[in-house]
């Protein structure tokens, strides 16, 4: 039995609000239950030095949590003078996932930076960030086309992500904090809307997991991500 009375495959209610702020070219507030993340996509001319002259664009991401996004206040990383290892890992995951969704040649020598700021955390912040960032990216690309910056839509796939895990011996989808903190296994899965995997990150926190359990978790992830694609499409329509 899950603490929230959800079934093993049941994801939390998802809300995607577009145009949440007025300045960013793409702005989305995404809510996975009590987890809330603001995803802003900003377009700038030019690319990082290592990309210059290649005729391709670039997508990067930054991730942070507000000091009181969690049960107790955490200092801002800026106050500590550097980003933590977890933050760096998550923003690289978000950026890699978004780049896999695009044909960078069609972006021209332009950069899109997606800022994912966690307003409230209750598990699954990185997967919510990826799912919301994808919608913000779509809106930023639409803006670029409307301004004549690009001629063709570079988006190859929609992408979405979900957490799955083993909790009290059972495979479950979309872990909230109380489940995540006690899970024997925690896995994050990023997929395209064509059913292909972009990234699978899985770690046994307690007991090692079997191949059969891994397959069960991946099936739950596929089922949950299909629902997330439906939510994205509904928001974009």
Swiss-Prot record:
<dbReference type="InterPro" id="IPR020568">
    <property type="entry name" value="Ribosomal_Su5_D2-typ_SF"/>
</dbReference>
<comment type="similarity">
    <text>Belongs to the RNase PH family.</text>
</comment>
<dbReference type="Pfam" id="PF03725">
    <property type="entry name" value="RNase_PH_C"/>
</dbReference>
<dbReference type="InterPro" id="IPR018336">
    <property type="entry name" value="RNase_PH_CS"/>
</dbReference>
<dbReference type="GO" id="GO:0016075">
    <property type="term" value="P:rRNA catabolic process"/>
</dbReference>
<keyword id="KW-0820">tRNA-binding</keyword>
<dbReference type="InterPro" id="IPR050080">
    <property type="entry name" value="RNase_PH"/>
</dbReference>
<dbReference type="InterPro" id="IPR002381">
    <property type="entry name" value="RNase_PH_bac-type"/>
</dbReference>
<dbReference type="InterPro" id="IPR001247">
    <property type="entry name" value="ExoRNase_PH_dom1"/>
</dbReference>
<comment type="subunit">
    <text>Homohexameric ring arranged as a trimer of dimers.</text>
</comment>
<keyword id="KW-0694">RNA-binding</keyword>
<keyword id="KW-0698">rRNA processing</keyword>
<dbReference type="Pfam" id="PF01138">
    <property type="entry name" value="RNase_PH"/>
</dbReference>
<dbReference type="GO" id="GO:0008033">
    <property type="term" value="P:tRNA processing"/>
</dbReference>
<keyword id="KW-0548">Nucleotidyltransferase</keyword>
<dbReference type="InterPro" id="IPR015847">
    <property type="entry name" value="ExoRNase_PH_dom2"/>
</dbReference>
<dbReference type="GO" id="GO:0009022">
    <property type="term" value="F:tRNA nucleotidyltransferase activity"/>
</dbReference>
<dbReference type="GO" id="GO:0006364">
    <property type="term" value="P:rRNA processing"/>
</dbReference>
<dbReference type="InterPro" id="IPR036345">
    <property type="entry name" value="ExoRNase_PH_dom2_sf"/>
</dbReference>
<feature type="binding site">
    <location>
        <begin position="124"/>
        <end position="126"/>
    </location>
    <ligand>
        <name>phosphate</name>
    </ligand>
</feature>
<keyword id="KW-0808">Transferase</keyword>
<dbReference type="GO" id="GO:0000175">
    <property type="term" value="F:3'-5'-RNA exonuclease activity"/>
</dbReference>
<comment type="function">
    <text>Phosphorolytic 3'-5' exoribonuclease that plays an important role in tRNA 3'-end maturation. Removes nucleotide residues following the 3'-CCA terminus of tRNAs; can also add nucleotides to the ends of RNA molecules by using nucleoside diphosphates as substrates, but this may not be physiologically important. Probably plays a role in initiation of 16S rRNA degradation (leading to ribosome degradation) during starvation.</text>
</comment>
<protein>
    <recommendedName>
        <fullName>Ribonuclease PH</fullName>
        <ecNumber>2.7.7.56</ecNumber>
    </recommendedName>
</protein>
<keyword id="KW-0819">tRNA processing</keyword>
<dbReference type="InterPro" id="IPR027408">
    <property type="entry name" value="PNPase/RNase_PH_dom_sf"/>
</dbReference>
<feature type="binding site">
    <location>
        <position position="86"/>
    </location>
    <ligand>
        <name>phosphate</name>
    </ligand>
</feature>
<dbReference type="GO" id="GO:0000049">
    <property type="term" value="F:tRNA binding"/>
</dbReference>
């Amino acid at each position: 039995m899950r603490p929230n009375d959800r079934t093993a495959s049941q994801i939390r209610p998802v809300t995607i609000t577009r145009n949440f702020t007025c300045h960013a070219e793409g702005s989305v507030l995404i809510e996975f239950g009590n987890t809330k993340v603001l995803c802003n996509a900003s377009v700038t001319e030019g690319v990082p030095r290592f990309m210059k002259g290649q005729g391709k664009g670039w997508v990067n991401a930054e991730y942070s949590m507000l000091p009181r996004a969690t049960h107790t206040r955490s200092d801002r990383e800026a106050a500590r003078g550097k980003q933590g290892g977890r933050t760096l890992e998550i923003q690289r995951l978000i950026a890699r996932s978004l780049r896999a969704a695009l044909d960078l040649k069609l972006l021209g020598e332009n950069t899109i930076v997606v800022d994912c700021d966690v307003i409230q955390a209750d598990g699954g912040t990185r997967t919510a960030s990826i799912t919301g960032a994808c919608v913000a990216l779509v809106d930023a690309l639409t803006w670029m086309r409307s301004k004549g910056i690009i001629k063709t839509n570079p988006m190859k796939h929609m992408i979405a992500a979900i957490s799955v895990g083993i909790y009290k011996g059972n495979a479950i989808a979309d872990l909230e904090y109380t489940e995540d903190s006690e899970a024997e296994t925690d896995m994050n899965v990023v997929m395209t809307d064509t059913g292909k995997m972009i990234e699978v990150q899985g770690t046994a926190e307690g007991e090692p997991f079997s191949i059969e359990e891994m397959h069960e978790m991946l099936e739950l992830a596929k089922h949950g991500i299909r629902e997330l694609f439906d939510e994205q499409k509904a928001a974009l329509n």
